[in-house]
Amino acid sequence: MLRSAATFPLLRVFTLTLVVLGCGCAGTGPGTGAPVHYRFFDPPDSNDIWTPTIRGWQSRERALTDTELLRPTEASLGARVSEGGGATIGSGGTHGDLRAEYFAFRAERKRALARDVAAWIQSEARHHYIPNGPIARWATLEETLANNGASCNGLELLPNRFLLDAGFRPDEVYRAIVMRPSDGQHHMVTLWFENPDDPWVIDPTGAMTTGMPHLSEVAGWVPVKVFSEYVEYTVHPDTVAPGSLAIRQAR
């Protein structure tokens, strides 16, 4: 088939374009195509130009001993934030105070993660719950995983340890023994003290509650002990504020 003379320049341009594009894609990265390896943790040289700036920031950042010291007041956070709402948006669709928005977002994400953990362990418990024998021996996390399950004493360690591994503070996440006064039944749950007076409850098996309610929302059970790997507290009714837990003073 014959082509007109005008067709050949167009074909040449089209062909050159494909070649250029093809070379551009294939030519990214090192010439050999081999992956680049880095040593990420070498000490800086004595004359490194970044060192003074980095060390100046490190010194100022270490002066803040606890991020919670930056937390705004509940009044500035607003009712939506304290009840689990999102960031506050000002008039005209503009965002409000960055400090309030940061802590509101952080609280919202932590609650969402904790609720996911509660839903997950309550689902897994249906397949991995192993009743206690004649003598109850509390399993460690290692033993619970090795045995592919445990009673509430072992299963509770999974959400508890997950929250700690995910960055929740060790002074806000505790194991707790709860008791049902109607029949003396005891149970193990995780308490997350986002609110020091009314913690969230994560029940691994659903024997006490499902989801992640506040302790004040769970009827028929009372906390007896609060503890971790390193500390142990006994829970008493707070005579200063009836109905709240007397644990803040013991920390």
Give the location of each predicted region.
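Bacterial N-terminal signal peptides that target proteins for export
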Residues: 1-14
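A structural boundary/capping signal
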Residues: 25-251
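Secreted/extracellular small peptides and ectodomain modules produced from precursors
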Residues: 1-2, 21-23, 150
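Bacterial N-terminal signal peptides
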Residues: 12-23
